[in-house]
Swiss-Prot record:
ATP binds at residues 387-389, 411-416, 500, 515, 526. This is Acetyl-coenzyme A synthetase. CoA binds at residues 191-194, 311, 335, 523, 584. Induction: By CRP and FNR, in response to rising cAMP levels, falling oxygen partial pressure and changes in carbon flux. May also be induced by acetate. GO terms for biological process: acetate catabolic process; acetyl-CoA biosynthetic process; acetyl-CoA biosynthetic process from acetate; chemotaxis; peptidyl-lysine acetylation; post-translational protein acetylation. It catalyses: acetate + ATP + CoA = acetyl-CoA + AMP + diphosphate. Keywords: Acetylation, ATP-binding, Ligase, Magnesium, Metal-binding, Nucleotide-binding. The gene is acs.
Amino acid sequence: MSQIHKHTIPANIADRCLINPQQYEAMYQQSINVPDTFWGEQGKILDWIKPYQKVKNTSFAPGNVSIKWYEDGTLNLAANCLDRHLQENGDRTAIIWEGDDASQSKHISYKELHRDVCRFANTLLELGIKKGDVVAIYMPMVPEAAVAMLACARIGAVHSVIFGGFSPEAVAGRIIDSNSRLVITSDEGVRAGRSIPLKKNVDDALKNPNVTSVEHVVVLKRTGGKIDWQEGRDLWWHDLVEQASDQHQAEEMNAEDPLFILYTSGSTGKPKGVLHTTGGYLVYAALTFKYVFDYHPGDIYWCTADVGWVTGHSYLLYGPLACGATTLMFEGVPNWPTPARMAQVVDKHQVNILYTAPTAIRALMAEGDKAIEGTDRSSLRILGSVGEPINPEAWEWYWKKIGNEKCPVVDTWWQTETGGFMITPLPGATELKAGSATRPFFGVQPALVDNEGNPLEGATEGSLVITDSWPGQARTLFGDHERFEQTYFSTFKNMYFSGDGARRDEDGYYWITGRVDDVLNVSGHRLGTAEIESALVAHPKIAEAAVVGIPHNIKGQAIYAYVTLNHGEEPSPELYAEVRNWVRKEIGPLATPDVLHWTDSLPKTRSGKIMRRILRKIAAGDTSNLGDTSTLADPGVVEKLLEEKQAIAMPS
């Protein structure tokens, strides 16, 4: 692997970077050798009401997984993201909002955002929301989504943000699991010129008889589109905040008080509510933001992620705002109405740091120079990538075309469960290799292990684990600590298992190779195969289903579903469309299968276990080495599947 061309650190970055190679080595060694000293010092990036004495109190031991950081300290997240900046930087822009329609944009100062958050915090209190209550937020990419999240944190309520692309069924499941007392939504969302029926989806979700906890729905008027209204339950955002005071004293929170729940797909069944707490999470989000993006005061920063994903929590809002940065929030999509939209937004707002996903980069790359037509992007200094491993071709295109061959690309590997960046370059400290996430961030101790959990040394490939805790780590799964332990700490004893595989080269750089469990990564979003299979099997005509991922040029992975129909049912183009729409309705558009492969039988072992390894190879057209098929109950099934595959048109 050493033949790969290394990108050296550009002189303009080296001259003013926050961390150089020598500092990285020294700080990294301190962070793993004396974590209490290191994190005790770094914790001062925040303002604490009651300073902490204890720094790290963590255990990955079987039966005793417990993660606590700064546990005797108190603080408030919203005060750290807003109040502490007011005296010196109250007039600095906190959020630049760029609408789906380019003629709509606005700048919101720290002073204005603070006022709006105080008003909404008082509104939540008026509605009877107390510290510890869960509030569901199902909003478009508008500043009010940030206001709602910060207001929850301000009063100590726990927010559960649900991505606006999820279906009513998925919304209901998350409301039920978290026992949300309030839902905050919008009449409609707007994306690529189309309206998204958010309020209607909430109405449908709340018709589920198992939703019993919701008392009110607060509705933001975004489009003025026609919506149904339930008197007494539904309340207009503007009516409520008009009457609210803009004075509010932020609640004193313990560092380990819950901050948010964010649902993420697992390899088994229903989504898991990942729980993050206040102190360690914000220290980690702020520190990683500052160092990985080499943030300097005055930088204009744009993270293209939706607030409904962890990237939107940590790196659209909380990390940047804790550092007093100007963060750009974009309602639209990178290639609408023209392929150059992303580049146009960069020029329009003079963006210095751009953080986006490989799926967007690949979609723009497919447009060639149309993606940069009429723009110069000269304001850019740092580029970043998130959501899935980026292929070297897309990395080089991004570096060359978007960044004019002068901006380091920080390819960040991390997860919902990690709270912030884990393996990532630092612009002034790391030479880059296209496609590699490079080296661990401070305090992160990655290892590669074999199937038995034995650590592998040197240049090698294996399962990626983390051997000790870090402040941003999720503390548990909401209401199910046993599942937390089972999912992340039972595969390899005394280690956090990421679910990803990786290889390490002779320079010690990490290359993420993708999931090793049954989780798909579609356009940078995690989807559990079990979740999609459950949705398919719930269809009245389907007997059995198995879902695998196949490589896709734009999305990274596409969804390939093997479907066995009930006796007497026949495949048809109508049923094909019906089944795809069914999954779309059950989970959301992201989960719609790209390919349905009708088949009478699936390859199973004698104990009835589906051999997914074989299904993955057949779907990907890789039939050179199907491995050992002797354990199959009926080896003839494989030939039949291969024949059926010949007739299937594959997505490009």
